[in-house]
A protein has these predicted regions:
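Active-site ExK catalytic segment of metal-dependent nucleases
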Residues: 91-100, 106
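A short, glycine/acidic-enriched catalytic loop
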Residues: 111
Length: 223
C-alpha cells in the first residue's frame, strides 16, 4: 500500500513538473494547446517534438505551426510548421507513416508498402508543400524570399528512392530534421535581417491556429 502511494505521488510530481515546464515553453505560447491535450494526441505531441528540436538550432529564428493559408476558391491549405531564419523560410510537411515509402517528385500519389504486401496510396507530400509555399508567397508578396521545402517522415518508415532533384527540397526522417536544417542553413546565403524575420513572422502569425477563426479550422479539408 505504501509503495503504491509513493508511485502515485511520483507520477503526480512528474506530471506537475513537466506541465510547469510546458507552460513556460514557446510551443505553448505559439500553439495555445494545453499540456494534457498535447501528451494525449499523437499529432500534437509529434509537432511538439518538432518544435523543441528546431528551438535548439543556434541563431535568430521564429517558428509557427498550423498556418491556415487562404486559397482562391475560399478554402484553405495548412502548412504544418514554418521555420524562419536568416537564410529564408523552411516549410515542413509532416507524415506519420510506417512501412516502405515509394514515390517521386512529379507523381500525384506516393505508395506506402506495409506488411503482407499491403499497399496504400497517399498524396504526394512534395506537391502538397509546393501548394503551401505558393500561398505563403502570396501572403508575403515578395518573390525574392528563399523558401525551402522539407518533407518529414516518421522514424518508423523506410524511405525508398525518394531523392529530390531540387536542392531546395528535402525528404527525410524525423531523426535527421535538425541535422538537415543546420546543413541547409550553413550552405545558404543570408538574405534576411532580424527585422525581416520578425516582419514575416507577424504576417504568417495572423493565419495560425491561435488566430484563425474556428470556422476556418473547421472548414479546412485535410488531405
Amino acid at each position: 500500500m505504501y509503495l503504491a502511494i509513493l508511485i502515485i505521488a511520483g507520477i503526480f510530481i512528474y506530471y506537475y513538473l513537466k506541465k510547469r515546464e510546458y507552460d513556460k515553453s514557446n510551443y505553448k505560447r505559439e500553439s495555445g494547446n494545453r499540456f494534457l491535450g498535447v501528451i494525449t494526441d499523437k499529432e500534437k505531441y509529434r509537432q511538439y517534438l518538432f518544435f523543441n528540436n528546431l528551438e535548439k538550432i543556434y541563431g535568430e529564428h521564429k517558428i509557427l505551426m498550423n498556418v491556415y493559408l487562404p486559397k482562391e476558391d475560399g478554402e484553405t491549405t495548412k502548412a504544418d510548421l514554418v521555420y524562419i531564419n536568416k537564410t529564408g523560410v523552411y516549410v515542413l510537411e509532416s507524415k506519420n507513416y510506417s512501412g516502405w515509402i515509394f514515390g517521386d517528385e512529379k507523381s500525384e500519389y506516393w505508395t506506402q508498402n506495409l506488411a503482407n504486401d499491403k499497399k496504400e496510396q497517399f498524396n504526394n507530400p512534395i506537391l502538397q508543400n509546393n501548394d503551401h509555399i505558393k500561398y505563403l508567397r502570396k501572403l508575403l508578396k515578395l518573390e525574392y524570399i528563399n523558401i525551402k521545402s522539407i518533407v518529414v517522415f516518421s522514424d518508423r518508415c523506410t524511405l525508398k528512392k525518394l531523392n529530390a532533384a531540387d536542392e531546395n527540397v528535402k525528404i527525410i526522417k524525423r531523426d535527421a530534421l535538425v541535422r538537415t536544417i543546420k546543413s541547409m542553413i550553413e550552405t545558404s546565403t543570408i538574405t534576411l535581417s532580424l527585422e525581416n524575420i520578425n516582419r514575416i513572422y507577424c504576417i504568417f502569425k495572423n493565419y495560425t491556429n491561435t488566430n484563425a477563426s474556428e470556422e476556418v479550422k473547421a472548414n479546412h479539408v485535410k488531405i
